[in-house]
C-alpha cells in the first residue's frame, strides 16, 4: 500500500517534470504567453486543493485518487491533439485540478496507512519520491524532445499520458483504502480543530517552497556564471543529492522518536547555514573547500519537508486529514510561483543572490515559527 503510493507519486511527478520541459517547445508562442499558460497549472491546483481536500473527507479516497489519475491521463493525451493556445490553456488549467486531486489523496491515504511511530519515515519516502520524480522527469522530458522532432512532439505527450495511465491502473489494482468513508461519519470520530496547531509551521513551510521555486532558476544561473562543471563539482553535487535523499528518510524516522517540530527547526537552521555559506563561496568558485561543512548542513535541510508533512497528518486526524493535506498543494503552488518570480529577478544579479535571497526569507520564518511554537 505505502510502496504503491511512492511509485504512484514518483511516476506522476516524472510526467509533470517532463511536461515542464516539453511545453515551451511544443507551443509556438512568445515566452510571456508560455509563462502565463504554465502559471495556470499551479494557480488552478492551489484554488482547487481545499475543495478537493474536503471532498476526500466525504468521499472514497481511493476512488477520488483514481479519478484524478484518469483526468491526468486524458488531459495530457488531449494536449497532444492540439496546439491551439486557448485549448492548451484550458487543458493545462484542468491538469492543475487533477494534480491537486492526485497529490491530496496520496498524502491523505499515506497518513491513513501510517501511525505516529512510523509516519515521519513514511513521509520522508513520499518527499523523496516527489522530488526524485520531478528531477527524473526533467531528464525524461529532455530525452523525449530529442527522440521526437517538432512535428512529432504530440507523441511525447502521449508517451507521458501512458505513464499516468500505468500509475492509474496500479491504483485500481493495488491501492487499499485504510479508512472507509462510512468510518469518517461515525459519531466516535472526533472532529479536530487544527487551525491553531498548524499555524506555527506555516512560515517555515512557505519559505521552504519559495526557496524550492528559486532553485528552478539555478540551471540558467549556472550557465550564465563562470562556474565550470568539473568532475569534482559534479561529484560534490551528486553527494548533495544523495545526502538529501538519505536525510529525508533518516530525519523522518528521527522525528518519529523525538518530535516533529524540533527536528523541523533543526533542519531549517541547517538549511540556513548552507544557503549562506554556499552563496558566500560561489563568487570565488571555492565552495569545494567547504564541502565538509556544506554536506552536513544540506543533509540537515532534508529534515524540513517530511517532518512538516508528518506533523500535519498527526494533528488532523482521520476526519479532516484530506482538508489538512490540501494545504500541501496550496502552499507548494503559491511558494513555487513566488520563488520563480523572485529567482528570476535575483538571478540576474548573480547566482549567489539566489542563495542569499533564500537565507533572507528563511531566517525570519524560523524566528516566527519558533516563537509561535513556544507560545503554544
Where on the chain are the PLM-derived regions?
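Helix-loop boundary and gating motifs at the non-cytosolic
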Residues: 1-42, 200, 208-226
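Hydrophobic core of transmembrane alpha-helices in multi-pass small-molecule transporters
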Residues: 10, 87-101, 289-303
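Residue-level signature of mid-helix packing/kink "hotspots" within the transmembrane helices
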Residues: 42-50, 134-135, 241-249, 336-337
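C-terminal ends and interior cores of transmembrane alpha-helices
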Residues: 70-83, 270-284
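Cytoplasmic helix-loop-helix junction between adjacent transmembrane helices
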Residues: 93-129, 310-311
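C-terminal membrane-cytosol helix-exit motif in multi-pass small-molecule transporters
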Residues: 162-183, 366-373
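Juxtamembrane intracellular "pre-TM" segments in multi-pass secondary transporters
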Residues: 176-203
Amino acid at each position: 500500500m505505502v510502496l504503491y503510493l511512492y511509485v504512484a507519486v514518483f511516476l506522476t511527478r516524472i510526467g509533470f517534470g517532463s511536461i515542464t520541459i516539453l511545453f515551451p517547445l511544443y507551443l509556438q508562442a512568445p515566452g510571456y504567453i508560455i509563462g502565463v499558460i504554465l502559471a495556470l497549472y499551479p494557480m488552478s491546483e492551489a484554488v482547487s486543493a481545499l475543495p478537493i481536500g474536503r471532498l476526500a473527507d466525504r468521499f472514497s479516497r481511493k476512488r477520488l485518487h483514481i479519478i484524478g489519475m484518469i483526468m491526468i491521463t486524458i488531459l495530457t493525451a488531449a494536449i497532444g491533439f492540439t496546439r491551439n493556445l486557448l485549448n492548451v490553456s484550458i487543458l493545462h488549467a484542468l491538469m492543475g485540478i487533477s494534480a491537486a486531486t492526485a497529490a491530496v489523496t496520496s498524502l491523505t491515504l499515506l497518513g491513513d496507512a501510517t501511525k505516529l511511530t512510523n509516519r515521519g519515515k513514511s513521509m520522508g519516502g513520499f518527499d523523496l519520491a516527489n522530488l526524485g520524480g520531478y528531477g527524473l522527469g526533467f531528464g525524461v522530458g529532455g530525452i523525449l524532445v530529442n527522440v521526437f522532432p517538432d512535428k512529432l512532439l504530440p507523441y511525447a505527450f502521449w508517451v507521458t499520458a501512458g505513464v499516468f495511465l500505468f500509475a492509474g491502473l496500479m491504483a485500481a489494482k493495488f491501492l487499499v483504502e485504510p479508512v472507509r468513508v462510512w468510518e469518517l461519519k461515525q459519531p466516535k470520530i472526533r472532529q479536530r480543530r487544527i487551525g491553531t496547531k498548524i499555524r506555527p509551521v506555516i512560515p517555515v513551510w512557505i519559505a521552504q517552497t519559495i526557496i524550492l521555486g528559486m532553485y528552478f532558476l539555478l540551471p540558467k544561473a549556472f550557465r550564465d556564471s563562470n562556474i565550470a562543471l568539473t568532475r569534482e563539482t559534479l561529484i560534490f553535487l551528486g553527494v548533495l543529492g544523495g545526502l538529501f535523499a538519505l536525510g529525508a528518510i533518516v530525519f523522518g524516522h528521527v522525528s518519529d522518536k523525538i518530535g516533529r517540530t524540533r527536528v523541523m527547526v533543526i533542519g531549517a537552521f541547517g538549511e540556513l547555514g548552507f544557503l549562506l555559506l554556499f552563496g558566500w563561496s560561489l563568487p570565488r568558485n571555492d565552495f569545494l573547500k567547504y564541502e565538509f561543512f556544506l554536506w552536513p548542513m544540506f543533509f540537515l535541510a532534508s529534515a524540513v519537508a517530511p517532518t512538516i508533512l508528518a506533523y500535519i497528518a498527526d494533528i488532523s486526524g482521520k476526519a479532516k486529514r484530506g482538508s489538512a493535506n490540501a494545504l500541501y498543494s496550496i502552499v507548494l503552488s503559491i511558494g513555487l510561483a513566488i520563488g520563480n518570480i523572485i529567482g528570476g529577478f535575483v538571478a540576474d544579479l548573480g547566482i549567489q543572490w539566489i542563495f542569499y535571497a533564500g537565507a533572507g526569507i528563511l531566517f525570519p520564518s524560523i524566528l516566527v515559527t519558533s516563537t509561535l511554537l513556544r507560545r503554544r
